[in-house]
Amino acid sequence: MKRKEFIKIIGLGGLAISVVPNGFSATLGTKTNEEICRSQWNTLCGNIGEVYKTDAFKYVHPKKGKPNVLIYGDSISILYTSEARAQLDDKATVFRLFKNGGSSQNFIPNMNTLQETMFQPNLKEGWDFKWDIIHFNVGLHDLKYLKGKNLNKEGKQVSSISEYKMNLQAICEYLKSNFPKAKLIFATTTPVPAHAKGRFEGDSVIYNKAALEVLEKYPDIKINDLYRFTKPHLETWAQEPGNVHYKELGFLAQGKEVAKIIETEL
């Protein structure tokens, strides 16, 4: 799969798009109180940093004159966030979603929660800035199969291909409608190894193909092909055989790659 850049043109027929209320848009020049924002952020995140044993969820405060970057994704992104943030430390302020982003159907509700919770006017003296770059991925939680709440290949798939494409198109429209000045970067879904629990090897290829079909309509959304970047190192980077997650060698390399791609848009 070759990394490409696509640029997107809005045009969605009858698809219903969730639009952030005007009240979510911060008024420029209003005071932001770091203590209030930090407290709100810590409440929003809860103990997720302890669960994942990472500082990816530590509070970061916007800095005057620095671009504001948001990383949205699942546990793969949770692991590489800290390295991406470190690589861009002198160039941008890198935020991430307050939780594991989950499947494509969770994207818009999660983004709305972030805006409603952390930004003015909903939070008095809260964040007061616009996103300059949003780097996002959905897919690994769409292609999985669940029986109840447990990963099980005999269970039901979270999102069919058609559902995934519909959700991703809605996501693109949502981002363009609510964050029109933000540069958007979509990261392809990383590989599913053989014998993965609740996931079938090769499904990432199928879902990435579907994603690229959607993104062809949005050529200004850049593609960060993390699948292609990761695939040659799957065996050496995997935490263990059959695990979709990566050990430090892998997620540090992914973090550097994500930072490199983001930097091209700064």
Language-model segments: what does each one mean?
Residues 1, 21-45, 49-50:
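C-terminal segment of N-terminal export signals and the immediately downstream linker at the start
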Residues 189-226:
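Substrate-gating cap/lid alpha-helix
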